[in-house]
Amino acid sequence: MIFIVISIDTRPEKRDDFLAGITRYCAQVRAEPGTVRFTCSEDVEEPNRFVVVANYADQAAGEAHVASEHAQWFFGWLPSVVSRVPTIVYQELPGAGWSEMSEVRLESAT
């Protein structure tokens, strides 16, 4: 599995543009074969800082994503809305996906 986390700081005056673009992009990426998860969340303490979490089934799925028309659009468009170059963590991990967190157990309803 490919696991990617990207930190994106947007320019305050471009926030609405970023939200519109990332919403469109997320939907396109989620529809790709081999995408396990693709989400974008805003940091609760840093306004205009967003974190993208992307998981692909394998390297081939990740490569297909990067080559896609919408990814090429995103990479070209992103500089128009960010305040700094995004930072990224990229890891190839064993396994096929997410598993339950063993430290947490749900409370039963009474």
Annotate each language-model stretch with its function.
Residues 1-2, 17, 33-35:
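Short, flexible segments with low predicted structural confidence
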